[in-house]
Curated annotation (Swiss-Prot):
Keywords: ATP-binding, mRNA processing, Nucleotide-binding, Nucleus
Compartment list: Nucleus
Keyword ATP-binding in record: yes
Positions of ATP binding: K91, S195, A196, G197, K198, T199, S200
Function of the protein: Required for endonucleolytic cleavage during polyadenylation-dependent pre-mRNA 3'-end formation.
Single GO cellular component term: mRNA cleavage factor complex
Protein name: mRNA cleavage and polyadenylation factor CLP1
Disordered, as annotated region: 218-283, 593-615
Length: 665
């Protein structure tokens, strides 16, 4: 073990630090110098009130910077004053290809050096390279098949249709009409038990796809002729990830090899300090920006869902303005804020998510009313297929599906929800993370598949650094995500703590704050939410299913009560105490109003719980525009007090309610 024990030199002093929750208290901070050895990882687990900041320092002998990354997101070298902050009980690991020296401000309750090489440099990289080859093949199909381009261009995706169900193999006519296997990038599903590291693997694969040296466009690039003309002249590249020439048509295979091996460029510290130059990126046209445009599909509506628990989302990524997903806080499971908030603009320190798609499940367990869960999946798959018909960059880059954790009860249904999602999203690769039985069962299931589209099953070991989390932590994360939606993020450290700590460590340090040290976690600003009182009848609030119904004896003679797991019921809090109690302290999803119900029975009574202005199925597939929190009710005045992220008119007066409760304390 002596060869991997790192020399950590630290100094400790008392400063006033604002914790990640913004309470402000005296904490004991330390400034440590850590040498991170090649292919190993330094594990950090923060507890409540703890925050750390990390930056590169040059080698004292050579003066060169090393390389390091967190779940595939690089810490940019060559900028000593750039700090990366982490808080909100984050659990993460720093790893390095060739070794690096980093400075750590603050201390965690748990931090240690792993005694085995990071999986980043074994199966994770091999998996990425296989996906890279699949993306290049998809791009070549789109580039060389004019008939495919013509088919996609002629497809009409403007018309809104009702997607069919994927209950059986080959079902789902609407989605199948839009789906074409040609030109499709890899569609990868990550499955495994809870706390196995599924989201971490998703972030790693997404980061390496975003940092790829490939050009994700059908044409060769607007700069192709210019670069070819001046190929013999010295040229300054914006980073190692674009150092190859993607526009040489003389030898496609050589170009593929260059792109596949481009990941090796990430390992060289001398190249890392040129990585992702903002000035160079600004000069490049859109078609010449390197990196794939993958889409993360978050199908776990529990803690860590996007943007809040109770949602499932498709998050299209772009390698701009930077090409990585950070991990500053578990409240931002993929390091980004989606535009569904209606208040948080894309951060300049992360990639952008272009027109994300979020749908409301209203629950944190997909097994609860699974028929409803599957129908929401139908709608999400339908929206994704429509997107991929016209967004060819995302099409060739593929899908990365983050699935709910597998539990013992799933085996009794032969992992029915997994099979359903495989059909709906046309999955071609299932990565089983750390679950031997699940790997064997899925292998047996798809060995007998006669559809001709059975996915490939890939088993990978669970990382030794995967952290088991308990129900208390999950509830904290649940509350933190909802709170950060309305209130944003505080800085991990106060300005006073930042200046004091730097000054106490170095007499020559000016009384200014180095870049990133006082940055809000995830670059999400602190918000001032708006509490307002609105008429009770301003919002049309619906829920799926009905907990309590009138007995049959209370119905008209001859009438029967027909209930469905997917029946949408309009709330009536004035006349129903159950609806009133359900509404108080709930988080409501404001959704895009679907087309009006033209086929409803004109003779039906407005008092009928099933009577409303929209088709049930249309409401299940309505896109989320934002959220409000019901903080108080006044039934005498028929008023609701709601909390909104910003003042002004609500984006919609059509709302869906689930079992998502939160108290603003």
């Amino acid at each position: 073990m002596e060869d991997i024990v790192d020399d950590v030199r630290s100094s400790t002093y008392q400063v006033v630090e604002n914790d990640a929750c913004g309470t402000g208290k005296a904490n004991l901070l330390s400034l440590s110098l850590l040498y991170l050895r090649s292919t190993l990882k330094w594990m950090i687990e923060l507890d409540a009130g703890e925050a750390v900041a990390i930056r590169f320092v040059p080698d004292p002998i050579s003066g060169h910077y090393g390389d390091a990354e967190v779940f595939g997101a690089p810490l940019v070298a060559g900028s000593q004053e750039r700090w990366y902050t982490f808080g909100n009980e984050a659990k993460f690991a720093i790893s390095s290809w060739g070794g690096a020296e980093v400075e750590i401000l603050g201390a965690a309750s748990t931090e240690y050096m792993a005694d085995e090489p990071s999986p980043t440099y074994t199966y994770c990289t091999n998996l990425h390279l296989n996906l890279e080859r699949a993306r290049i093949r998809a791009r070549e199909q789109l580039r060389t098949d004019p008939s495919l381009q013509k088919i996609l261009e002629d497809m009409d995706v403007s018309e809104r249709t009702i997607p069919a169900s994927y209950e059986q193999h080959g079902a789902g006519a609407s989605g199948s009409d839009l789906y074409r296997a040609a030109g499709q990038g890899p569609r990868v599903m990550i499955v495994g038990p809870e706390s196995a590291g599924k989201t971490s693997l998703i972030k790693f694969l997404a980061n390496y796809a975003l940092r790829s040296p490939a050009l994700a466009n059908v044409k060769e690039g607007d700069d192709a002729s210019r670069r070819a003309k001046h190929r013999s002249e010295p040229e300054i590249h914006p980073g190692p990830d674009v150092a190859h020439d993607d526009d040489d048509d003389d030898d496609v295979e050589n170009r593929k090899d260059d792109e596949e091996s481009g990941i090796n460029d990430m390992k060289h510290p001398k190249n890392r300090k040129k990585h992702s130059s903002a000035d160079s990126q600004a000069k490049k046209t859109l078609s010449d920006i390197t990196g794939w445009w993958p889409m993360i599909v978050a199908l776990d509506p529990s803690e860590g869902a996007v943007p809040v628990p109770g949602c499932v989302s498709a998050i299209p990524l772009t390698p701009m303005p930077t090409n990585w997903l950070p991990s500053p806080s578990p409240a931002l499971p993929y390091g980004i804020t989606t535009q569904t908030t209606g208040t948080l603009p894309p951060s300049v320190s992360t990639v952008q998510s272009v027109m994300p798609i979020s749908l409301w499940m209203g629950k944190e367990n997909v097994r609860e009313n699974e028929r409803h869960s599957r129908r929401v999946i139908d709608w999400l798959a339908y929206y994704i297929e429509k997107r991929l018909v016209k967004d060819w960059r995302a099409r060739m880059s593929g899908l990365l599906l983050d699935m709910p954790g597998v539990i013992t009860a799933d085996a009794r249904t032969r992992y029915g929800f997994i099979q359903y999602c495989v059909r709906a999203f046309k999955i071609d690769t299932i990565v089983v993370l750390g679950h031997e039985k699940l790997n064997l069962e899925l292998t047996r299931i798809y060995a007998n598949d006669t559809s001709g589209h059975a996915p490939r099953i890939v088993k990978v070991p669970r990382s030794g650094g995967a952290v088991e989390v308990d129900e208390v932590y999950k509830q904290k994360l649940h509350d933190l995500q909802i709170r950060s939606y309305f209130y944003g993020m505080p800085p991990a450290l106060t300005k006073e703590a930042a200046v004091t700590s730097m000054s106490m460590n170095d007499e020559n340090t000016p009384a200014s704050i180095p870049a990133g040290l006082d940055e809000h976690l995830g670059a999400v600003p602190t918000l001032s939410p708006y509490s307002t009182t609105i008429p009770l009848d301003l919002l049309s609030i619906y829920r799926v299913g009905q907990d309590r119904v009138a007995p049959s004896s209370a119905l008209p003679i001859g009438a029967e009560r027909v209930l469905s797991e997917m029946q949408v019921v309009k709330l009536d809090p004035v006349n129903s105490s159950n609806d009133m109690s359900m509404l108080l302290h709930s988080v409501l999803a404001l959704v895009e109003p679907p087309p009006r119900n033209q086929s409803k029975d004109e003779t039906s009574s407005p008092d009928d719980p099933g009577h409303h202005d929209y088709e049930d199925d249309e409401l299940l597939g309505a896109a989320i525009l934002g959220f409000v929190h019901v903080s108080d009710m006044d039934l005498h005045r028929k008023k609701l007090t709601v909390l909104s992220p910003k003042p002004g008119k609500l984006p919609s007066t059509t709302a869906l309610i689930g079992n998502l409760q939160w108290q603003d304390m």
